[in-house]
Amino acid sequence: MTECGITGIPLYMDADAALFHTLGLRSVPSLAVFDSQGQLLRATADMPNADEMAQLLDAAQHPAQQTLAFLKQLIQADGAIPSTYTLSGGAVHPGDTVLSETMGQTMLYAAQTEDAALFSDAWCYVRDKMTVGGLTVWRIQAGEKAAANASLDDLRILRALMEADAVWGGYEREIRERAAALYAACVVDDALVSFANVDGSGRGDRVTLCYLDVETMRALSAYDVRWTAVANRSEAILTDSRALMSSELPLYRASYTPAKDMFSNAAAQMTEAALTILHAAQISAAGEQTLDWLDAQLGAGAIYAQYASNGQVGYGFRYEAIGSYAVLAQVGAVSGHTELARLSLAKLENRRVATGTFAGAYGSVKGETSYTFDELEALFALMAMKP
């Protein structure tokens, strides 16, 4: 072991081979690496060399730092973080699309970790390249701005600005102006609709449930009291008995149309459903029925990418979305469902690239398109799981 650089940390022999069999290992010697909380990070029969061992230990001891270092490789000279990338040929290849979602996630994580340089880079890009009339266009693709915003992304950017203002000061005017712009564009009868055209030519008529970040709305009410009513209506939508698909599938429905007082019956996209559950959990409104269902699915082995309204896995969606596990780890941490948090984090960490050029990434090393959403939500999950 010392030849692999393993010194100064606890080593344990699996004397009765219980762990060997539990993890499904097939050869001797094998190695299992755990973090300080006993979370399994890696189990392998390929014994690492000294450099690989150092990266494995770094993943165990400083997982967020490793992932953040990878993420910073994607940052462009103007502060943009592409929403997709591929890993191939020993290099990271960024995509040509920037989402307000990704930029808002970056701003929020930077504010919460007091990373002033990262926050400044992301905020300057949002302010200078993505903002039109106080709203943030949801996408810039190959340099071309989208015509509309996404109200959740504007809420997330506002949350990041509020947290930055609490740490460094100097953002109150921006918060007030952007909160007023979002209210004027996207609030109808106290309901936050999903989007508005940034030129003022129209808006959506549906409320996307995963956009209902009530906690942020309540924080915004300190700057603009009108957001109190929006928060109250949003909480009422989330707690409406019709918001869950069924007792057999207690996931939140995708959307609600206020004019028709009707919830949609569309299939549940798991990452969106997980975000809705997280927002509900943050205000202690996530039902035990929903949390127990998640526990049961994870206990049975997996939570899949989509579920039809009848509770069956959607055709072509019997795969696991890594971003949903990152969000569900946060749900477990916020709601006190420790087993949900633990199992979700285990699923997440099983996808971590722990060694090599791409250490810290959660994407595919086979050249497939990967999403920075996953790395960013993983960073929030790791923060939420800190003892």
Feature map (PLM): residue ranges:
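Thiol/disulfide oxidoreductase modules built on the thioredoxin-like
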Residues: C4-I6, D16-L56
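Short glycine/serine- and small hydrophobic-enriched flexible loop segments
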Residues: M107-E114, R156-V167, E215-A219, L278-Q282, ...
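C-terminal structured domain segments
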Residues: G316-E320, A326-E368
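Inward-facing hydrophobic residues that define packing positions of alpha-helical scaffold repeats
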Residues: A110, W123, L161, A179, ...
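Aromatic-lined substrate-binding rim segments of carbohydrate-active enzymes
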Residues: A110, D115-D128, R156, M162-D165, ...
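Internal amphipathic alpha-helical repeat/solenoid segments
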Residues: T67, L71-Q105, A110-T113, L118, ...
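Terminal, non-catalytic domain-edge segments
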Residues: Q65-Q66, A273, H279-A285, V334, ...
